[in-house]
Amino acid sequence: MTFGTLAVISVIAVLGPLLALPKRWHQPVVLGELIAGILLGPTGIDRLPAGDVTLTFLAQIGFALVMFVAGSHVPVRDPRLRESLRIGAVRAIAVGIVAAALGVVIANIFGTGHAALYALLMASSSAALILPIVESLRLGGLPVLQLLPQVAIADTACIVALPLVIDPQHAARSALGALAVLASAAVLFVGLRHLERTGARKRAHDVSEERKFALELRTSLAVLFGMAALAVSTHISIMLAGFSFGLAVALVGEPRRLARQLFALTEGFLGPLFFVWLGASLDLRVLGSHPSFIVLGVALGLGAIAAHVAMRLIGQPMSIGALAAAQLGVPVAAATIGTQLHVLRAGEPAALMLGAIVTIVVAAVGGALAARAGLVSAPAIAQPKRPTTSGDVL
């Protein structure tokens, strides 16, 4: 690990958004970063040492921050989420049932034995991808409102369940670790809400702002790293630690100042570093020697789309179903954890990412079709902003 490596990654962090620059494509910035990592890794010129201990550790910090941001973006406080909760929950469960059947079929065809993992991937939805598309296209109407809880439920459930299904031999240990992390997140939520209601947060914020202490950022990083340490000690991925902490913050209310600080830290450096490292960790040359995994990746992507589009049978427009199929966080986490635990076959992590790319492309098309179909409204869907007098939570 050298400053030259960091300089290259920082340049990629600048160039990564170029792929997402055309607004009509609605492609996430991370695609450019992943592609850059792939080109710098063993698939391309092999100049980025993804196995470097220091780089890997920095990437894990970025992973925790990326999952925290994803959790904080779940619109759990949006009143429209509660209004459409029932139909959204029904559709999320129905997608899971269809995905379970498809997972068994795909696992049997390819002989991998990962039916549960494939089902989880195909049932997942990425709030971090879907909500920006909804906002940029100004999508609205009842079908879009019903999409919110469906995505929130699927995103949360799949991320919580992933550590259990990716390593079933240690499912009991993983379950206990997951419970410990989730219990810690629940305690954090209670504590954050208490600080908010008693005004302690406001007083600390005022002192921090006046004295330039950056208490919000320091406190949040301390909590995040503490939860990551708990996750590692209980043999659980830091993915769950970051995501559950993000949900706890979202339940209290997305803090504007903290959101800006963590956005700068995550999107400016550690997030791109993680995605570049992930791309460099994927040896896509294996797909050339195992072409069946190319078919597996396409099958997973198309299976996810089919499972979500099938909700047309219970009233969801096909374009919205295609949009709901967008995946990112769960496949990225599965590829990362599977590689670290050595539970996936050579080329399988790349196949998971290929499937995610297929869903992203189709989701962008689905969003555009929904806009053309007139599913548009003036207000964008976003996390409700807190009153300006309430400041930022710790």
Located regions from the model:
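Membrane-interface junctions of multi-pass transporters
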Residues: 22-25, 29, 39-87, 206-296
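Transmembrane alpha-helices that form the ion-translocation and gating core
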Residues: 80-140, 288-349, 353-374
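Alpha-helical transmembrane segments of multi-pass membrane proteins
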Residues: 12-13, 17, 37-38, 42, ...
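C-terminal ends of transmembrane helices
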Residues: 12-25, 68-83, 128-140, 190-205, ...
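Structural signal for the N-terminal portions of transmembrane helices
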Residues: 3-10, 52-62, 146-155, 161-164, ...
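Intrinsically disordered, low-complexity non-transmembrane regions of multi-pass membrane transporters
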Residues: 7-10, 186-219, 254-259, 372-394
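Structural signature of hydrophobic alpha-helical transmembrane segments
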Residues: 1-11, 51-68, 111-127, 176-188, ...
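Hydrophobic alpha-helical transmembrane segments in multi-pass integral membrane proteins
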Residues: 3, 45-47, 100-106, 157-169, ...
